[in-house]
């Protein structure tokens, strides 16, 4: 049996990979592990808008209550809201039912601990072990069985928290918001209108059949069109569970996570709030991002791909901002996970405070051309490039040739017999040739 937990909880095609039975078992095992079986657990449960959410919530809740848990149901709400509300309601755990940016047929179950952090691998392993080994758990009867309560004020609690993360309001700004027919539909329209912005909406109903379909952070084309048509100051695109944000400037250009992090980090530094003068990002962030930070005297720490690794580094080093090119951005002084709504508020607030258009702010960073070529290598030899002296020497030579204005990244595929060769630099033709020759060298040496 393959590992249940991936890099972001348990995920798969709903009712096929992620069945009601599995959701039930995850509820039982999760509640038991997160309270060490010592007391009646209190668990916050939220979901995005996808149509399998009701089915999985019912099954998950049955599992939770079968071990005596008190379930707080907060309905359709962003993933970061569950992290925040778990802390606010002093719960033992939070659970989000969502597959984030994935298509409608997918769903997922993701746990948060009592402090609103995603679970470390070892805790997920304990939950998984109970399920796989079919370990018997207590089954209370009578008044020992748990109950479910709907908290109707949860959305208001989260909106008021979001407002507290910026100073002032957004009066005078015209903003187009794409909610991807997902969880932000229940929050963003109210939030931005209450802050005084003129708001134009797209995909702002929680319609499960339409979630992420040609909309949201992975498909910003309609948002770009609406920003230009309406003469808006900024466009904001969330994904299905609103833990990530991609923006569009007033000219209709996409502003990705790298640009947003650069804008926010520079602003934090100006205000003396950039902790340890450092930003955390993954190996996939563009070399242009690194250069932009360096020009401002800001340090960059890179991690493996995945916001969980960014968060681990942030908590370890006490840093205030980190994230991914995809728009997962963590403001650790405000929330314990990537929060698209907070990111959107920070970006709009910086634009209003500075009096600068988003295109002017985004000019702090130039995205360097990037070339990606797959080298075909047998699975058992994918990591051998680390030991090959000729390959290592060639990588060093290429980076020396680019003189700090480019980089080489080698990443073995996790699922295919491939090694991905990525080269970034100023001259597209030059880096294309570099990537091609390096990929050929890797194939020749490792096959």
UniProtKB/Swiss-Prot annotation:
Listed name of the protein: Phosphoglucosamine mutase
Post-translational modification: Activated by phosphorylation.
Primary role: Catalyzes the conversion of glucosamine-6-phosphate to glucosamine-1-phosphate.
Catalytic residue positions: 100 (phosphoserine intermediate)
Designated gene of the protein: glmM
GO BP, one annotated term: carbohydrate metabolic process
The entry's keywords: Isomerase, Magnesium, Metal-binding, Phosphoprotein
Disulfide bridge partners, by residue number: none
Top EC class, one word: isomerase
Annotated positions binding Mg(2+): 100, 239, 241, 243
Residues bearing the modification Phosphoserine: 100
EC number: 5.4.2.10
């Amino acid at each position: 049996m393959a590992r249940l937990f991936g890099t972001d909880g348990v995920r798969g095609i709903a009712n096929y990979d992620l069945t009601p039975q599995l959701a039930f078992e995850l509820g039982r095992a999760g509640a038991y592990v997160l309270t060490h079986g010592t007391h009646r657990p209190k668990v916050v449960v939220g979901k995005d808008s996808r149509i399998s959410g009701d089915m999985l919530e019912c099954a998950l809740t049955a599992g939770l209550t079968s071990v005596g848990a008190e379930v707080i149901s907060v309905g359709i709400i962003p993933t970061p809201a569950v992290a925040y509300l778990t802390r606010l309601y002093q719960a033992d755990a939070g659970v989000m039912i969502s597959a984030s940016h994935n298509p409608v047929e997918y769903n997922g179950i993701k746990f948060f601990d009592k402090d609103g952090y995603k679970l470390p691998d070892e805790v997920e392993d304990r939950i998984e072990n109970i399920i796989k080994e079919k370990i018997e758990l207590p089954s209370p009867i009578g008044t020992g069985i748990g109950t479910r309560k709907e908290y109707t004020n949860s959305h208001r609690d989260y909106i008021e928290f979001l407002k507290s993360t910026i100073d002032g309001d957004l009066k005078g700004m015209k903003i187009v918001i794409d909610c991807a027919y997902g969880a932000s539909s229940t929050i963003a329209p109210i939030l931005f209108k209450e802050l005084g912005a003129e708001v134009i909406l797209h995909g702002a109903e929680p319609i499960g059949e339409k979630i992420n379909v040609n909309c949201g952070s992975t498909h910003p084309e309609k948002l770009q069109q609406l920003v230009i048509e309406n003469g808006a100051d900024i466009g904001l695109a969330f994904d299905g569970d609103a833990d990530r944000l991609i923006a569009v400037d007033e000219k209709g250009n996409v502003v990705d996570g790298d640009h947003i992090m650069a804008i926010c980090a520079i602003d934090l530094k100006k205000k003396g709030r950039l902790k340890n003068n450092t930003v955390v990002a993954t190996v996939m962030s563009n070399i242009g991002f690194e250069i932009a930070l360096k020009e401002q005297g800001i340090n960059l720490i890179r991690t493996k791909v995945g916001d969980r690794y960014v968060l681990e580094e942030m908590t370890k080093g006490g840093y205030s901002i980190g994230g991914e090119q995809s728009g997962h951005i963590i403001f650790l002084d405000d929330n314990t996970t990537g929060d698209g709504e907070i990111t959107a508020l920070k970006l709009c607030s910086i634009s209003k405070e500075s009096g600068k258009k988003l295109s002017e702010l985004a000019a702090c960073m130039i995205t360097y051309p990037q070339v990606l070529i797959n080298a075909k290598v047998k699975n058992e030899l994918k990591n051998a490039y680390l030991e090959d002296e000729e390959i290592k020497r060639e990588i060093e030579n290429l980076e020396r040739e680019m003189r700090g204005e480019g980089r080489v990244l080698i990443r073995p595929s996790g699922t295919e017999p491939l090694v991905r060769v990525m080269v970034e630099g100023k001259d597209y033709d030059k880096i294309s040739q570099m990537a091609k020759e390096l990929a050929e060298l890797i194939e020749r040496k490792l096959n």
